């Protein structure tokens, strides 16, 4: 469901030759989030939009509530749906953005226009969310003691080691509110 402001009526300006739905980045992000919540209620979704000179984009992050990535087949369905709302693709061979051909419409044939330039889907929680920190903690637990993680492990040991050492070490990367939420999640989940 979109706000009424997304509907542009024929003749509302001198350039509007037909009624259409303006699918800017903000509206696209909203539609994708609604889709995920409706069809995949166990999936946590973050959908944000950015507008900048020369274009716009939508970032979609999905995970389970414990921070783990969702099943690959579900992620592919979400990505496929999300990518329908991308205006085109960048062709690096000729250094040019190429717009998709054809017209997309709603079920009642109202045209959808002016999509974001890019839609990015990530099978991981949004940075800074509680789910992100839960994912990072589980990642550390899985890799602790390996050669690639010895320096990180030693930093956590300086903060007392274990779950509390990990929390204390990573606190500087969190806002106070995020830290409180992560502490609460650690008490109830881990």
What are the residue ranges of the model-derived segments?
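Intrinsic low-complexity, intrinsically disordered or marginally ordered coil/linker segments
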Residues: 1-190
């Amino acid at each position: 469901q979109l706000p009424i402001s997304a509907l542009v009526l024929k003749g509302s300006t001198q350039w509007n030759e037909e009624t259409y739905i303006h699918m800017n980045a903000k509206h696209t992000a909203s539609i994708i989030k609604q889709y995920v919540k409706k069809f995949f209620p166990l999936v946590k979704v973050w959908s944000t939009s950015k507008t900048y000179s020369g274009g716009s984009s939508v970032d979609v992050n999905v995970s389970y509530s414990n921070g783990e990535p969702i099943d690959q087949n579900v992620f592919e369905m979400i990505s496929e749906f999300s990518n329908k709302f991308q205006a085109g693709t960048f062709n690096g061979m000729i250094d040019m953005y190429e717009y998709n051909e054809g017209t997309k419409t709603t079920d009642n044939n109202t045209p959808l226009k002016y999509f974001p330039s890019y839609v990015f889907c990530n099978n991981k929680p949004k940075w800074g969310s509680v789910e992100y920190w839960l994912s990072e903690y589980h990642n550390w637990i899985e890799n602790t003691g390996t050669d690639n993680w010895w320096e990180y492990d030693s930093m956590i040991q300086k903060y007392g080691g274990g779950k509390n050492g990990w929390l204390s070490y990573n606190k500087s990367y969190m806002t106070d509110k995020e830290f409180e939420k992560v502490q609460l999640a650690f008490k109830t989940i881990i």
